[in-house]
Amino acid sequence: YNKSRQEVLVMRVKAIMMPFSKLACISVENTVEEAMKIIDEQGLLSLPVVDGQQFVGVLSKQFLFEEFFRNYTGTREEFAQRKVMEFMKTRIETIGENTRIEEAAAMFITSKVRFIPITNEQNKLLGIVTQQAVFKEYQKIFGNKHNSMAIYTYDIRGVLGRFMGPL
């Protein structure tokens, strides 16, 4: 048994998560303008939305743009002053910090999310795990010592492309 291959089977997302203390988040009470400032300054595509430390949803730059250009009839200034809670997506799957890394990888395959929120039993946001963090961990474990890596997935067009996604 290769010891490093054995370790990946028990690796937990808490080992690779970005902790809450280092995370860019936005409050439900913040404005769209404040959220966009954080998104743009940090080069992000989306932000976790919190109420205190309680995870309540995700705000994506793409969704804000779609809402503004497709559905909004007011001024840009009025839109910028609206609250984040009006635009966040709340039906977001979360995982616990003891979830196995391969389970997180499988979630990335079946969804369009860039990150997965990690919460405790009280829905307190502990951090996030990103696609990039998962792939970096696999790269550390497998490195260049192996000629290939097997990925098992459903036989559906585009699944492998979504799994590999932009890093």
Name each model-derived stretch.
Residues Y1-N2:
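Intrinsic-disorder-associated, low-complexity terminal segments enriched in Asp/Asn/His/Tyr and depleted
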Residues Q6-K22, S60-G96, R100, A105-I109, ...:
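Tandem CBS (Bateman) regulatory domains
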Residues M11, N30, E34, L59:
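Conserved active-site and cofactor/substrate-binding residues in soluble primary-metabolism enzymes
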Residues V32-K37, A105:
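Short, basic/aromatic recognition patches
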Residues I39-Q42, L47-F63, F108, I116-Q132:
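A glycine-centered beta-loop-beta connector
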